C-alpha cells in the first residue's frame, strides 16, 4: 500500500507542472525554459503569443481593410460600418453610437453588445487578418506599423491596455481569447527578453 501511495504521489508530482503551466489553452513562459537555444525559445514564445493574436477577439478589430469583423465566425460587422477618420467609425455612425463603456447583455440573456471606453478599430497599419505569425511579428517590431511603440511600450500595451484586456471579458455570446491578459503580458516580456525573434515564415 505504501508503494502504491508513493507511486501515486510521484505521478501527481510528475504531471502537475504541465497542467499548472497551461491556463485556458495558453502556455506560460516557463513551459519554454527547456528550449536551450535562445532564438528558438524566443520564436516559440512568439508563436504562443500568436495563439492569442489570431483569436477572433483580436482579429475582428485588426482588419486589413475598413470593415471590422464580429463574432466567433468573424463575419462582416452588422449593421454595416466603416473605419472612418481616426478609426472610430463614420460621421453620424460612430462606434460609440452602439458601443458603450461596458458590455451590455441582451434582455434575452443570449448575446451582448460589446463595450469599452474607448471602442475603436486598430489603425489599418496594424491589420492582422490573413497575415502569418512571421508577418505579424515583423509588423509589431516596426515603429512605422505599430503606433511608434518600443518593445517596452508593446509589452505595456499587451499586459495592461483595457481594450486588449476586453478580449478576455468579451461578454455573453463570445469566446474569450485563450489564457489571460497577465499570461499574454508575461509571454510578451519573455519574448522580448530572449531577443524578440520572429518565426522564419
Regions found by a protein language model. Give the residues of each.
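Processing junctions and N-termini across compartments
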Residues: 14, 52, 89-92, 131
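Electrostatic cytochrome c docking/interface patches
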Residues: 31-52, 68, 72-88
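C-type cytochrome heme-c attachment and multiheme electron-transfer modules
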Residues: 40, 56, 103, 109-201
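The canonical Cys-X-X-Cys-His
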Residues: 56-65, 92-103
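Post-cleavage N-terminal segment of exported redox proteins
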Residues: 2-44, 56-59, 64-69, 189-201
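Short, solvent-exposed loop/turn and secondary-structure capping segments
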Residues: 62-64, 70-74, 107-111
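Short, well-structured alpha-helical interface segments that form or flank functional binding sites
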Residues: 44, 56, 90-93, 183
Amino acid at each position: 500500500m505504501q508503494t502504491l501511495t508513493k507511486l501515486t504521489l510521484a505521478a501527481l508530482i510528475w504531471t502537475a507542472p504541465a497542467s499548472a503551466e497551461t491556463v485556458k489553452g495558453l502556455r506560460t513562459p516557463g513551459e519554454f525554459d527547456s528550449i536551450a537555444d535562445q532564438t528558438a525559445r524566443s520564436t516559440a514564445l512568439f508563436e504562443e503569443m500568436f495563439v492569442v493574436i489570431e483569436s477572433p477577439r483580436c482579429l475582428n478589430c485588426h482588419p486589413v481593410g475598413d470593415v471590422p469583423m464580429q463574432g466567433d465566425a468573424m463575419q462582416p460587422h452588422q449593421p454595416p460600418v466603416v473605419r472612418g477618420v481616426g478609426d472610430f467609425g463614420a460621421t453620424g455612425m460612430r462606434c460609440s453610437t452602439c458601443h458603450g463603456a461596458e458590455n451590455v447583455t441582451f434582455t434575452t440573456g443570449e448575446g451582448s453588445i460589446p463595450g469599452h471606453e474607448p471602442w475603436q478599430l486598430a489603425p489599418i497599419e496594424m491589420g492582422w487578418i490573413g497575415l502569418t505569425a512571421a508577418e505579424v511579428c515583423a509588423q509589431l517590431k516596426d515603429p512605422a506599423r505599430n503606433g511608434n511603440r518600443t518593445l517596452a511600450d508593446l509589452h505595456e500595451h499587451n499586459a495592461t491596455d483595457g481594450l486588449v484586456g476586453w478580449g478576455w471579458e468579451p461578454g455573453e455570446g463570445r469566446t474569450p481569447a485563450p489564457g489571460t491578459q497577465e499570461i499574454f503580458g508575461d509571454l510578451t516580456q519573455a519574448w522580448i527578453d530572449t531577443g524578440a525573434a520572429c518565426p522564419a515564415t
